[in-house]
């Protein structure tokens, strides 16, 4: 079997500024920080099921990542003609291939229940980058920037080293009744490097734990008994450590699969509440609430009926 797709990996879009009171000599001034861009990937997946061992499936994903991102830091003197404003700009372009492997084993029992065990592994990835660095000064003329001088310009090559990761999981299902699942993941972010620099005091290995369950009271009963009720919990130690404090995350979710047709079409609704970070050591904790809606169709499209 074969499958493909195009998905975003990351998106950067921010602007932040810090203004200072007006000074009698230099006037007002402020620092401005900005960034934009993103990385996308094209995926091609292949799966194979050996004829001599049909309970096992093997998969390979080949991914091509590409994109660019830009960030800048500006010191601005908008009210003074005697002081030059300055800006530092960084432009990065990336292009690289990445591969990951997966296996799945499924055992069906005589009563119709099924046990599924899966594992995946993402290889470490070397990403070459094209880097542009520019530092220049400018002044304002009626709020229009006029470039005065290029202080420094560099065009170099570098690299990003993405770490290996793997995950394992299992699920047990009783068809049209219930399903429970557990999975564990690990990513070696302590080995991440950007332009040859590692960040051992900030980045650490990340462990994730997830558990979930789905229950259908009676698919032949009334409407509320046909609803799929879902519950899940997730926890990750986090890849960041700030001020010697781990930035972990925990969340719980509740969902419903609402049937709207006999063929199996559903409207899926979920609600997730979680916490990320901590208030210890003068840090910030984020409490978030997510709501999602999706639609799954299992109707027979493009089916030509014999009788109208």
Where are these regions (language model features)?
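Subset of outer-membrane beta-barrel
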Residues: 1-308
């Amino acid at each position: 079997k074969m499958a493909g797709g195009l998905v975003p990996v990351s998106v950067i879009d921010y602007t932040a500024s810090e203004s200072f009171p007006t000074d009698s000599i230099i006037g007002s001034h402020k620092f401005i920080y900005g960034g934009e861009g993103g990385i996308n990937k094209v995926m091609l997946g292949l799966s194979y099921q050996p004829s001599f061992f049909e309970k096992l499936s093997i998969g390979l994903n080949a991914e091509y990542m590409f994109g660019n991102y830009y960030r800048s830091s500006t010191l601005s003197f908008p009210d003074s003609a005697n002081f030059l404003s300055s800006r530092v700009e960084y432009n990065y372009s990336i292009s690289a291939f990445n591969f990951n492997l997966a296996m799945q084993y499924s055992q069906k029992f005589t009563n119709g229940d099924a046990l599924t065990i899966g594992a995946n592994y993402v290889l470490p990835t070397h990403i070459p980058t094209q880097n542009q660095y520019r530092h220049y000064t400018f002044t304002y003329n009626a709020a229009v920037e006029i470039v005065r001088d290029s202080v420094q310009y560099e065009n170099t090559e570098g690299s990003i080293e993405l770490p290996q990761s793997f995950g394992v999981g299992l699920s047990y299902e009783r068809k049209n009744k219930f399903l429970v699942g557990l999975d564990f993941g690990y990513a070696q972010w302590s080995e991440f490097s950007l332009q040859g620099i590692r960040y051992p005091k900030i980045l650490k290995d990340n462990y994730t734990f997830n558990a979930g369950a789905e229950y259908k009271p009676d698919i032949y009963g009334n409407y509320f008994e046909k609803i799929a009720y879902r519950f899940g919990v997730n926890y990750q130690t986090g890849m960041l450590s700030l001020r010697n404090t781990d930035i972990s995350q925990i969340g719980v979710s509740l969902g419903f699969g609402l049937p709207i047709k006999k063929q199996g079409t559903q409207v899926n609704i979920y609600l997730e509440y979680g916490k990320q970070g901590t208030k210890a050591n003068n840090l910030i904790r984020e409490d978030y609430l997510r709501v999602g809606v999706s639609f799954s169709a299992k109707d027979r499209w493009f089916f030509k009926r014999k009788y109208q």
